[in-house]
Regions:
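Nucleic-acid substrate recognition interfaces
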Residues: 1-442
Length: 442
């Protein structure tokens, strides 16, 4: 599989010039979008992207062999670079092709269920790709030449690249393939976004020999990890709490609440501080999970599938809004794939509510007269860490799903008859995995 990573390098100066360059590029994309919409019947005859780009150029670009064109691009965009022109055509083709597909699906759907008609494609906030030799030349370690619109023409200018950004890329991406950079604007600053690609081959390991890291992401603690095998054995446990970071986040949120009580003004500075602390928690959590997976040499990281759709209710809804669980999972997936580790998700229902020994529903916190909500009591009277109990159930559900996949349909029905809770994945626990292994061994 191919992995892509984007690193940004800040440029110094030339902000007004970059603004004009991007404005002209967006106008060119809008021009080609109108042409593609008008001549789509002809353009769609091309099967490949290159064929369609050539068809659009034959309609818009005057040459010695094609002096008369119905849509003269050069009349409105004098000396527009050919590399940038083809990039604008490709961008417009993608937008119009997507619109035509959506329109066909809308027309084929039932009138009562198809909803509103797809809107015409818009240019949007697109940015130009700086193709090498034509738009971008690296003149030094911390300097590059880019072709921009300056003094009413397209010319080369030298831009300085921030040293810390370049050094970071040289340190982390020396062995990766560097792709074409893209000019991007974030806030009031301009960056060159460099995309790096590498090919990774994930190992194929049988489910019997697979070692996993089951991860439970929590609201009270950052994460709880358990290293497990297919027999249900737990080889290791790791905890990450980050109490200082969570205290800082609570302190920042309380500042926001106090400011909102005093006046109705917006507080972007306070929200920026809280967001920065929250992002720091997410980054440290993702790094801890991947480092633990490498430490125990696991083949797969298993997490819950978290669905945040719908309105959040209850006294903890603000904490749910601030919870960066999906951000953590996306970072873990990127980091794990770079280290040839697979990532899987399982059903999250009842992972914390059911005891891993199969005794039934657990009671947490005040419900069981316990001092902390992170502790729970099983129906048998055993007191246990609730997040650790959930991580056992998460890992067990992954093994149950993968083991049942390897069985023929009839054999799977026989095993499900012996272990009835396997029919409902939301009721599976560690005891279900042990029973499944016993049924397979019988």
């Amino acid at each position: 599989m191919k992995l892509s990573m984007t690193y940004r390098v800040r440029t110094k100066g030339f902000n007004h010039i970059f603004n004009e360059t991007v404005r002209l590029y967006r106008q060119a994309v809008s021009f080609f979008v109108d042409v593609c919409l008008t001549e789509w019947n002809l353009i769609s005859t091309g099967k490949l992207q290159k064929e369609r780009v050539n068809l659009v150029e034959s309609l818009t670009v005057r040459t010695r062999q094609n002096p008369a064109v119905p849509y003269d691009f050069s009349a409105a965009f004098y000396k527009f670079p050919s590399y940038l022109r083809r990039a604008a055509i490709a961008e417009a083709l993608g937008k119009v092709s997507s619109y035509q597909s959506n329109l066909e699906n809308w027309e084929a759907a039932e009138p009562e269920k198809r909803g509103a008609k797809p809107s015409l494609p818009q240019t949007g906030f697109v940015y130009p790709a700086m193709y090498r030799s034509g738009m971008f030349i690296r003149t030094g370690m911390y300097q590059a030449a880019v072709k921009v619109f300056i003094r009413n023409t397209w010319d080369w200018v030298l831009v300085d690249l921030r040293k810390s950004d370049v050094d970071y890329i040289e340190h982390h991406c020396a062995n990766y393939k560097e792709c074409v950079p893209t000019l991007q604007k974030r806030g009031k600053k301009w960056y060159l976004d460099f995309v790096f690609q590498t090919a990774v081959q994930l190992p194929e390991v049988s489910i019997k020999d697979t070692r996993i890291l089951a991860v439970d992401l929590g609201l009270n603690s950052a994460c709880t990890c358990s290293v497990m095998t297919s027999e249900g054995a737990v080889l290791g446990r790791e905890f990450l709490s980050l109490p200082g970071e969570y205290d800082s986040l609570e302190h920042a949120v309380s500042h926001i609440k106090h400011a909102q009580k005093l006046c109705a003004r917006k507080t972007p500075g306070l929200w920026k501080q809280a967001k920065g602390i929250n992002d720091d928690i997410a980054v440290k959590t993702a790094r801890f999970i991947v480092d633990t997976a490498i430490k125990y040499d696991v083949d797969c990281i298993v997490m819950e599938y978290l669905d945040f759709a719908g309105k959040k209710r209850g006294s903890k809804k603000q904490r749910l809004h601030l919870w960066r669980a999906k951000y953590v999972q996306s970072m873990v997936m990127d980091k794990a794939h770079r280290n040839t580790i697979r990532v899987a998700r399982v059903c999250a229902w009842n992972t914390s509510r059911l005891a891993f020994d199969g005794s039934g529903r657990v009671m947490r916190g005040k419900e069981a007269d316990l001092p902390s909500y992170s502790l729970c009591r099983f129906p048998t009277g055993k007191q246990y860490n609730c997040d650790l109990n959930a991580s056992y159930n998460i890992g067990s559900r992954y093994y149950i799903r993968e083991l049942l996949k390897t069985l023929p349909a009839t054999a799977g029905q026989v095993v499900t008859a012996k272990v009835p809770e396997l029919a409902h994945r939301s009721k599976c626990t560690l005891s279900s995995l042990i029973k499944l292994n016993a049924a397979l061994a019988a």
